[in-house]
Every structure is written in structure tokens, then in C-alpha cells.
């Protein structure tokens, strides 16, 4: 006679074991119709699963995050159902959920085309609209293996052989004649899986191992209703338009080439943006009382062995040899900063010591993971390390948080997700040390009025950390900033200070990054602004153009005035119609276009237009210079005439 406790605290008693669906039906027909699965004692279970003892139960519907994930997982099975009907000889591998969708890896004797994807999608919809029931059956290990052996599903057999104990009773999900194996849960009926889109096919090695066979990975997205799907596809279209790789090429910001994979060739305009970001961050370093340093980009293997990087990070490090010594190109800046700290005796009076560097780092990322500026091998970190005493941690973290938000707000990022990662199983240090460190980070976040998500056990082995993720205009999340406590590295590299009692003590080190990789951050803001950089960041802030040759000298005078004021300006004296010039510079996303005709010369003015098409009328040259300088100085996000 199980007693089921519902989320509102109410209880229902049943005379016999009862399924999740039957509990939903006892509450109401509407809830039963919406039921996808249940959370029994906090564990996700299928709607058909039986509850035989007292338990808590939450019904999962399409409105829940878990419900949407289950819809996506079941849509992956629906894809398997359709593939087996259209390509009976295909072998199915794995089909998990991912962010916003799912994929299925398959072994097929020919490459899939876009026409194949269209046909698969049509068959999936045809099957889903029959609203068939998904039937779950628990079977013995041997019965599961016999089932897949009879169907020639060698990858499913391998999963059973290598990953599932022979004592287990795996769950087989029956989609009419199609059978798949999964931990579940899955939807009880395919009426929940009507809103999906197959997106692309890519290659993927079985088990992620390049020694294994290359399979075809079919990616798809699935949503709870038609509007959610349409909104997501619209965001994808917008993301494609904003792709920093396309915009970077169109605006001549940078390029990459095969001879230097994952390394950026910055062109003049892209490098201008890069240097402006550095200049901006430098103003903040001064404001928040940091020293700026510069360490070598390559150091002896001996040092990296001391830090543990050689043993734990070796695959991602580029190495070289000289005069019988082995060196590693630095993947991060922290060991170098400790070397600087160790030069000369440090007293407690010297702490906190805040050390920052625009450090050039290299990591040997797999070639398949490289993606424009977002994932590179050579990058520059706006890195800092703060050496402090334990009692200074909370105040220093508070200062870091303020700096993070100060910088992000300048770029218009207001929606920032904050996560606190706590002690992992493989941590070093005492319980007391960790408890205080986690409490200090939480207290700093709370003192700043920040809501945060706790990620249990997700901290580094050497200390807890705070992560800051930016949510952009397309609702994508970009993890950029980190504040990481480190009890480990300073001790390993013999960092110490003389405490007030004259004892030698090891400082706490706080790793702090805000932009993260400057290259990646440029990719992020290129997509956020769609290449319409605010005036202070724009490589060219204004173009001055003539209507006829008679205004050429005046144009040059205006250009000199703007240039002398420290503004980035160009002249366009080509023998082209002014409309053609305006269109061209609009496509180049130049913030302001200044047109000089005879009337403007007579009045000592310029006619001002913006890249968004606003006609701002005429300005005295001095007025425009002051207006633009004010915008640049204030790092304003919008141009004149923009709301």
C-alpha cells in the first residue's frame, strides 16, 4: 500500500503498487495527458514504471527542463526508427541528447546527403503522427544481446559486452518494430515528439577513438511545441548571419590558414580592436591597483614537472628542445607569475599583491575542435594572479567580482550566469581549508547581491572557483570569467611571505580572468554586435568623403582635424558617386560617414550619416570632433541617432 507524497506535500495512498502514469491519472485527466515521466524520490523514471513503496513523486511534463530533454532523447530513437525503415542494413551506435537537441551515430555503407536527411525527417514526422505508444521492457542481459545479435546490431552488442554487467536487466524501448536500448526515461507516446528538425551530418569515430571506424553522426533539434522550434531555428539563422568567421572576412579583421592551424593572423583592423581591448583592460588594471608584468612564453620542463602540468596537461602542451634541455611553451601564465613573486623577500605588508599579464599562451587543442576565434591554439589571456593572506580572500574576491561586472557592463552584457564550483573528490588540503574557502566565495557573491548556482564537486582539485557566463542576444551562454582559489601551486613552487609573527607562510593565490581569451572575446562581441562595433572599438570610426574633386582639399583638412584629435578616420576621395561610397562604407560597418560638398565647405561643416542610415544633419567640424571624442571616451555602446 504505497503512500505517494506530491510536491505540495499532499499524499495519496494506493492499495497496490502503482505506476507513475496511474498516479497522474488519479490526480486528473489533464495531468495524465501531459505526463512524460516522473521523478520518484528525486530519480527520473518512466511513466510506466511501478512504485511499490512509499515515495515522493514529481510529474514531469513538457514544461519542465527534464521533460524537454526526454523529448529530445525519444526523438533520437524516432530517428533510429526512421533510419531502419529507409536503410534496413544500417547499424545503430549511440544517440544521446546534447544542448538544444540530439544526435545519432550510425554505420552506413554510403554517405548521407541532404536529400537523405529530408527523407528521414519526413519519415520521422510520418511515424510520430501515428502517435504510437513507446513500450519499455526490462530483459535479461542475454535476452538483450540475443535481440541485437538477431538484428545485426554489432555496436549495441559491444555496449552490452563492454559497459553493462551480465547481472543487470537492461531496458529495451519498443518503437513498434524498432527496438533500442537505453537507461531512459522516454516519452510514453510519440505525440510528444512532433516538433523537430534534422540539421546536419558529420563524421565521428566510434567511442571517440581515431583508431576505430568513422561513423556518420546525424544532428537534430527537438522542442516541446511548434513555436519553440520556430524560435530556435530563427536564432540559428541569426547566428549564421552573425558568424564571426564570415564577418571577420567581410570586415578584413583576420584570417587563419592551414600552415598555422588554430593561430590567428590579425589584419590591421582586427588588431586595432585587439589593442583597444587591451587598452581598456589596462585602464581597469590601474583603477583596481594591479601591477602589469610579462613572463617568458617558454620554460624548462623541470618547472612544469614541479607544477604538475607536465604529468596532467602534457598532451596539450607544445614542446621543443635546445642544448639537451626540454622546454614547454606555456599553456597558462600562473607558474611564471609565481616566479616573479618569488624574486625578493615578501612581507605580509606587501599583500595583497595583484599581478596581471596579457599572456600569450598555446595549447595543442585537437584539430577537429578548432573553430574560428572561439577555439584556437594560440591565444592571449587577460590573466591575473592575486597573492594574499587567507583573511584577505573574501575582500579580494569581492574586488574581482566588481571588476568583472564593471568590464562586462561596458560591452552591454547584463545577463550573467554565476556558478560556484565546490570541492571535488580528488581535492588536496584540509576540510577546514576548503570549508573556509567555499564560504569566502559564497559570502563575496552574496555580499554583491548575486544569485548563483552551486556545482557540487566541480571545483579544481586545488581550490573552489566562481565562473561567469555571458548570455548573448541569441540566448547563448559563453563562459568567460573565472575566479579560482589555489592552495596548491604556491606551495609547490615555494612561494612564501613573512607573516606578522615572523613565520614563513604560503600565500593563497587567486587566479582571475575576465575576458578569458581575447581572441575568443573578439569572436563573441563580433557576433553580439553583428560587426556593428561601438564607436570606441570600431577600427575606422569615421570616413570623410567628397562629392566632386573640388572638395578633396577640404576633406583632407577634416581628416587631419579628426586624426589630430586621436580619432581613427579615413578619406575616400575616389571618383565615385557619393551614394556608392556611402553604401560601401555602410557594408564595412563604419560608424559615421561625413559628406563634404560645396555647401559644407562654405559653412565649415560636415554632413553626418550613420551606418544604420540615420541622417544627423550638418555639424561644425569641431562639434563633431567633440561629440565623437565624448562617445569614445565614455565607451558608449550606441551612436548618435540610435535608441
Curated annotation (Swiss-Prot):
Q: Which GO terms describe its cellular component?
A: cytosol
InterPro entries attached here? Answer: aa-tRNA-synt_IIb, aa-tRNA-synth_II, aa-tRNA-synth_II/BPL/LPL, Anticodon-bd, Anticodon-bd_dom_sf, Beta-grasp_dom_sf, TGS, TGS-like
| Statement: the UniProt record of this protein carries the keyword tRNA-binding | yes
Q: Per the UniProt record, which EC number(s) apply here?
A: 6.1.1.3
Keyword terms, alphabetized: Aminoacyl-tRNA synthetase, ATP-binding, Cytoplasm, Ligase, Metal-binding, Nucleotide-binding, Protein biosynthesis, RNA-binding, tRNA-binding, Zinc
What are the binding positions for Zn(2+) in this chain?
Answer: 334, 385, 511
Task: Give cofactor(s), names only.
Answer: Zn(2+)
- Listed GO biological process terms: threonyl-tRNA aminoacylation
Which reaction(s) are listed as its catalytic activity?
A: tRNA(Thr) + L-threonine + ATP = L-threonyl-tRNA(Thr) + AMP + diphosphate + H(+)
Q: Which residues form the signal peptide?
A: none
- Cellular location(s): Cytoplasm
Bound cofactor: record note: Binds 1 zinc ion per subunit.
Please name the GO terms that the record assigns under molecular function: ATP binding; metal ion binding; threonine-tRNA ligase activity; tRNA binding
Q: Where is the TGS domain?
A: 1-61
Q: Does the keyword Nucleotide-binding apply?
A: yes
Say which domain of life the source belongs to.
Bacteria
Q: Gene3D superfamilies recorded for this chain?
A: 3.10.20.30, 3.30.54.20, Anticodon-binding domain, Bira Bifunctional Protein, Domain 2, Threonyl-trna Synthetase, Chain A, domain 2
| Principal EC category | ligase
The entry sums up its family as follows: Belongs to the class-II aminoacyl-tRNA synthetase family.
Function recorded in the entry: Catalyzes the attachment of threonine to tRNA(Thr) in a two-step reaction: L-threonine is first activated by ATP to form Thr-AMP and then transferred to the acceptor end of tRNA(Thr). Also edits incorrectly charged L-seryl-tRNA(Thr).
User: What binding partners and quaternary form does the record give?
Assistant: Homodimer.
Query: Under which name does UniProt file this protein?
Result: Threonine--tRNA ligase
Biological classification of the source:
Bacteria, Pseudomonadati, Pseudomonadota, Gammaproteobacteria, Pasteurellales
Amino acid at each position: 500500500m504505497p503512500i505517494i507524497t506530491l510536491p505540495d506535500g499532499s499524499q495519496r495512498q494506493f492499495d497496490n503498487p502503482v505506476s507513475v502514469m496511474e498516479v497522474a491519472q488519479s490526480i486528473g485527466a489533464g495531468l495524465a495527458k501531459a505526463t512524460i515521466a516522473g521523478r520518484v524520490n528525486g530519480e527520473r523514471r518512466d511513466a510506466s514504471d511501478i512504485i511499490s513503496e512509499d515515495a515522493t513523486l514529481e510529474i514531469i511534463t513538457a514544461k519542465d527542463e527534464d521533460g524537454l530533454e526526454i523529448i529530445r532523447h525519444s526523438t533520437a530513437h524516432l530517428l533510429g526508427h526512421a533510419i531502419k525503415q529507409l536503410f534496413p542494413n544500417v547499424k545503430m551506435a549511440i544517440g544521446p541528447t546534447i544542448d538544444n537537441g540530439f544526435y545519432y551515430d550510425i554505420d552506413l555503407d554510403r554517405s548521407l546527403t541532404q536529400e537523405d536527411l529530408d527523407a528521414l525527417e519526413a519519415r520521422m514526422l510520418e511515424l510520430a503522427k501515428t502517435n504510437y505508444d513507446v513500450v519499455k521492457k526490462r530483459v535479461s542481459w542475454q535476452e538483450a544481446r540475443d535481440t541485437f545479435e538477431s538484428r545485426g546490431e554489432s555496436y549495441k552488442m559491444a555496449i552490452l559486452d563492454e559497459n553493462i554487467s551480465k547481472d543487470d536487466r537492461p531496458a529495451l524501448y519498443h518503437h513498434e518494430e524498432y527496438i533500442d536500448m537505453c537507461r531512459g526515461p522516454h516519452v510514453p507516446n510519440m505525440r510528444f515528439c512532433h516538433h523537430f528538425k534534422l540539421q546536419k551530418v558529420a563524421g565521428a569515430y566510434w567511442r571517440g577513438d581515431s583508431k576505430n571506424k568513422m561513423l556518420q553522426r546525424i544532428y537534430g533539434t527537438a522542442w516541446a511545441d511548434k513555436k519553440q522550434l520556430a524560435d530556435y531555428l530563427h536564432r540559428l539563422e541569426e547566428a549564421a548571419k552573425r558568424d564571426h568567421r564570415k564577418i571577420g572576412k567581410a570586415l578584413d579583421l583576420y584570417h587563419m590558414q592551414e600552415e598555422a592551424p588554430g593561430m590567428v593572423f590579425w589584419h590591421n583592423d582586427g588588431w586595432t580592436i585587439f589593442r583597444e581591448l587591451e587598452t581598456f583592460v589596462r585602464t581597469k588594471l590601474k583603477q583596481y591597483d594591479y601591477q602589469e608584468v610579462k613572463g617568458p612564453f617558454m620554460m624548462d620542463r623541470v618547472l612544469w614537472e614541479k607544477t604538475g602540468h607536465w604529468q596532467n596537461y602534457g598532451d596539450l602542451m607544445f614542446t621543443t628542445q635546445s642544448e639537451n634541455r626540454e622546454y614547454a611553451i606555456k599553456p597558462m601564465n600562473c607558474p611564471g607569475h609565481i616566479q616573479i613573486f618569488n624574486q625578493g623577500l615578501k612581507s605580509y605588508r606587501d599583500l595583497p599583491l595583484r599581478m596581471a599579464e596579457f599572456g600569450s599562451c598555446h595549447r595543442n587543442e585537437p584539430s577537429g575542435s578548432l573553430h574560428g576565434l572561439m577555439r584556437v591554439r594560440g591565444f592571449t589571456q587577460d590573466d591575473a594572479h592575486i597573492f594574499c593572506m587567507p583573511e584577505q580572500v573574501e575582500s579580494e574576491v569581492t574586488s574581482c567580482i566588481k571588476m568583472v561586472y564593471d568590464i562586462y557592463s561596458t560591452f552591454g552584457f547584463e545577463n550573467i550566469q554565476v556558478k560556484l564550483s565546490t570541492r571535488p573528490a580528488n581535492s588536496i588540503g584540509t576540510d577546514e581549508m576548503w570549508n573556509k574557502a567555499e564560504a569566502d566565495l559564497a559570502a563575496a557573491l552574496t555580499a554583491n547581491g548575486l544569485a548563483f548556482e552551486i556545482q557540487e564537486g566541480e571545483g579544481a582539485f586545488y581550490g573552489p572557483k566562481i565562473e561567469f557566463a555571458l548570455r548573448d542576444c541569441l540566448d547563448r551562454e559563453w563562459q568567460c570569467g573565472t575566479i579560482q582559489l589555489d592552495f596548491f601551486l604556491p606551495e609547490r613552487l615555494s612561494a612564501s611571505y613573512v607573516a606578522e609573527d615572523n613565520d614563513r607562510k604560503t600565500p593563497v593565490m587567486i587566479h582571475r580572468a575576465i575576458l578569458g581569451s581575447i581572441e575568443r572575446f573578439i569572436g563573441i562581441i563580433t557576433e553580439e554586435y553583428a560587426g556593428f562595433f561601438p564607436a570606441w572599438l570600431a577600427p575606422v570610426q569615421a570616413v570623410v568623403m567628397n562629392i566632386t574633386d573640388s572638395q578633396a582639399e577640404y576633406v583632407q583638412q577634416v581628416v587631419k582635424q579628426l586624426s589630430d584629435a586621436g580619432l581613427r578616420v579615413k578619406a575616400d576621395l575616389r571618383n565615385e558617386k557619393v551614394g556608392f561610397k556611402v553604401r560601401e562604407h555602410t557594408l564595412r560597418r563604419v560608424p559615421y560617414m561625413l559628406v563634404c560638398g560645396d555647401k559644407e565647405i562654405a559653412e565649415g561643416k560636415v554632413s553626418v550619416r550613420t551606418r544604420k542610415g540615420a541622417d544627423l544633419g550638418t555639424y561644425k567640424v569641431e562639434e563633431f570632433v567633440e561629440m565623437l571624442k565624448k562617445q569614445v571616451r565614455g565607451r558608449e555602446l550606441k551612436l548618435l541617432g540610435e535608441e
